[in-house]
């Protein structure tokens, strides 16, 4: 089956639901080396990008453009000079993303990263167009990375055409996702770094999920206070 520009139908397998779907292939697309779609229409429609009003600090979707309650809590806990400058994310956290994230992180399906590469890269370029930022993926503990076989933050950082730096050391192996919200907000710092390891750098932390912001805020505090970074912002795949 062809269309006026030439070409035909290309059969593909969805990375999220494993079903077969079709993609129209034109000579123009082939000439421009347009990449294959990775996600079927049904799954793509369930991935909700963040639009509309957000918290200006953490990027949480909400009905008004105002600082959210979690960010107000962080302001009382950490000096403004040691806080994240801002966080921005691509998708909201819904049932579809919950299942996908579980496959990606906890069942070791690293190939799923390719389902998000295009949206992750294009959104990043819009939010952080300045080329002088340095990416710092959030590290896992050695044990966790060996168990999983990869670090999802590293894979996400590799989707972006920017230099990466790895100054952070993970101290605590306990999963932040297993803690209650109040425990995450009040837990001790879980990172360390060498003195002046990020001196003068404008850093963007990369991670998969922003919940309360505990992981990212503690990483920022470490890099600003001990690493002497000039600024720290963050970019995540999902904002819950």
Swiss-Prot record:
The answer to whether the entry has keyword Isomerase is no
InterPro entries for the chain: ComF/GntX_DNA_util-trans, Competence_ComF, DZR_2, PRibTrfase_dom, PRTase-like
Give the GO biological process terms. Answer: establishment of competence for transformation
Q: What happens when the gene is disrupted?
A: 5-fold decrease in transformation efficiency.
Q: Which domain of life is it from?
A: Bacteria
Q: Which UniProt keywords apply?
A: Competence
Task: Report the induction information.
Answer: Part of the comF operon, encoding comFA, comFB and comFC, transcribed in competence media (minimal salts plus glucose) once stationary phase is reached.
Query: Matching CDD domains, A to Z?
Result: PRTases_typeI (cd06223)
Query: Per the database entry, which stretches of residues form a coiled coil?
Result: none
Name the job this protein performs: Involved in transformation (genetic competence for DNA uptake).
* Membership in a protein family: Belongs to the ComF/GntX family.
- Describe, as the record does, how this protein assembles with itself and its partners: Monomer and dimer in solution. Interacts with ComFA and DprA; ComFA-ComFC form rings about 150 Angstroms in diameter with apparent 6-fold symmetry.
Name of the protein in question: Competence protein ComFC
Q: Which organism is it from?
A: Bacillus subtilis (strain 168)
Q: What is the lineage of its organism?
A: Bacteria, Bacillati, Bacillota, Bacilli, Bacillales
